[in-house]
Regions:
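PLD/PLD-like phosphodiesterase catalytic module centered on the HKD motif
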Residues: 1-207
Length: 207
């Protein structure tokens, strides 16, 4: 229904999806129909993509895969007019696969708070940056690596998201994982985070 609703808005419709796999025939059929009616569709899919875009000449469809050191499992679905004419956001466990949609118990949760929606917009914005390393599905249905030749932290979407989230929490007064010791973290819960961040950023996010 959400895809069909965007389709009714034609060229004003917009759909953004971040998932691991896009396989379900029914969902793909709906997306293709929406694309042919002018809906702008952005698909960030880490793994399997069964949708072909070679037959969608002139359609506003972008498909990319963004990989990194972490095996991501987050799903984000955004529909420009899905909430009484305003953007609707969902996060959850389900990929657009028949096994997820028809054979399993999965959860999709609507995101209502403006702050949380802004977080999702930020993540999607980073994933669609032009200066990150990614693979893109071309109109001839082949995957092409694009972005900087060298895969460095600066051009790693996952690293950029981690850095942004860490800096945001620090700016709001959260305890810095770089400063933890036995006195500030007696339970030891933050020490693994400190070790991970040190490996990624060096001794600190500005190192």
């Amino acid at each position: 229904d959400l895809i069909r609703n965007e389709r009714r808005h034609g060229t004003d419709g917009r759909i953004s999806m971040k998932m691991n796999s896009l396989v379900d025939e029914g969902i793909i059929t709906e997306l293709v129909g929406a694309a042919r009616d002018g809906v702008s569709i952005d698909l960030c899919v880490r793994s399997i993509v069964s949708m072909r875009i070679g037959d969608l000449d002139g359609a506003r469809v972008r498909v990319r895969s963004v990989l990194g050191r972490f095996l991501e499992h987050s799903r984000i679905y955004r529909f420009a007019h899905g909430d009484e004419g305003k953007p609707a956001y969902f996060i959850g466990s389900a990929d657009m696969m028949t096994r997820n949609l028809d054979l399993r118990v999965e959860v999709l949760v609507p995101v209502k708070h403006d702050k949380h929606r802004a977080w999702l917009d930020k993540v999607l914005g980073i994933l669609w940056s032009d200066d990150i390393v990614r693979f893109e599905l071309d109109p001839d249905d082949t995957w092409v690596r694009r972005g900087p030749e060298t895969f460095t932290f600066e051009h790693d979407a996952q690293g950029r998201i981690m850095h942004w989230a860490t800096e945001l929490q620090l700016s709001q007064g959260a305890p810095s994982p770089y400063d933890v010791d036995e006195e500030t973290d007696p339970s030891g819960l933050l020490r693994p985070i400190k070790d991970t961040l040190a490996r990624i950023f060096g001794q600190g996010p500005d190192a």
